[in-house]
Amino acid sequence: MYLDQIKSELVEAQDVLNKFISDENNIKLIQEAALLISNSFKQGGKVLSCGNGGSHCDAMHFAEELTGRYRENRPGYPAIAISDASHLSCVSNDFGYEYVFSRYVEAVGQKGDVLFGLSTSGNSKNILNAIEAAKTKGMKVIAMTGKDGGKMAGLADVEIRVPHFRYADRIQEIHIKVIHILMMLIEFEMAKQA
């Protein structure tokens, strides 16, 4: 009944992944992002992560695996997903949804911390505002984007972009793969310090 559609979806996902892998720069950027986060942790910094919708879930997933665990039993790493419901509703109501992440960065971000922002379009105003706030605070910025990077293109210290122009879900599939690789590399790098 749906066998052809199922296979077609899997083939398209594989094609997007293969295209991403074929650009050697993407591999280098993943390593650069992992080292940037690890160095922040080693110097007492933390990660603040944010996104909208499915990307918000990915931001929470990333923070959870930093504070909890990925594959290895090890100390928790300092990470916060900007997902507190009372903060989000307060700022949305009082200032506007475009400030929900930047207000949090202004409140708890410090020089040497890392903002990890996800936007499949690269155009999310609240992520753009968070990037601006992070830079003002002297933080480093890692952006995970899609398509052509949108307005976020060129704003981050490290941008990992999935150049897919059809649906956001394909971009998110690569984002979660990258998040898992980042976790693995961060655990490797932090184990050197233990």
Swiss-Prot record:
Keywords: Carbohydrate metabolism, Cytoplasm, Isomerase, Metal-binding, Zinc. GO terms for cellular component: cytosol. InterPro entries: GmhA/DiaA (IPR035461), Phosphoheptose_Isoase (IPR004515), SIS_dom (IPR001347), SIS_dom_sf (IPR046348), SIS_GmhA/DiaA_subfam (IPR050099). Its main location: cytoplasm. Its EC number is 5.3.1.28. It is found in: Cytoplasm. One of its GO terms (biological process) is D-glycero-D-manno-heptose 7-phosphate biosynthetic process. Its cofactor is Zn(2+). One of its GO terms (molecular function) is D-sedoheptulose 7-phosphate isomerase activity. The keyword Zinc applies. The keyword Cytoplasm applies. Pathway: Carbohydrate biosynthesis; D-glycero-D-manno-heptose 7-phosphate biosynthesis; D-glycero-alpha-D-manno-heptose 7-phosphate and D-glycero-beta-D-manno-heptose 7-phosphate from sedoheptulose 7-phosphate: step 1/1; Bacterial outer membrane biogenesis; LOS core biosynthesis. It comes from the Bacteria. It catalyses: 2 D-sedoheptulose 7-phosphate = D-glycero-alpha-D-manno-heptose 7-phosphate + D-glycero-beta-D-manno-heptose 7-phosphate. Substrate binds at N52, G53, G54, E65, N93, D94, S119, T120, S121, S124, Q172. Residues 37-194 form the SIS domain. Zn(2+) binds at H61, E65, Q172, H180. Binds 1 zinc ion per subunit. Catalyzes the isomerization of sedoheptulose 7-phosphate in D-glycero-D-manno-heptose 7-phosphate. HAMAP family: GmhA. The reaction produces a racemic mixture of D-glycero-alpha-D-manno-heptose 7-phosphate and D-glycero-beta-D-manno-heptose 7-phosphate. Belongs to the SIS family. GmhA subfamily. PANTHER family: PHOSPHOHEPTOSE ISOMERASE (PTHR30390:SF7), SEDOHEPTULOSE 7-PHOSPHATE ISOMERASE / DNAA INITIATOR-ASSOCIATING FACTOR FOR REPLICATION INITIATION (PTHR30390). Homotetramer. This is Phosphoheptose isomerase. It comes from Haemophilus influenzae (strain ATCC 51907 / DSM 11121 / KW20 / Rd). The lineage of its organism: Bacteria, Pseudomonadati, Pseudomonadota, Gammaproteobacteria, Pasteurellales.
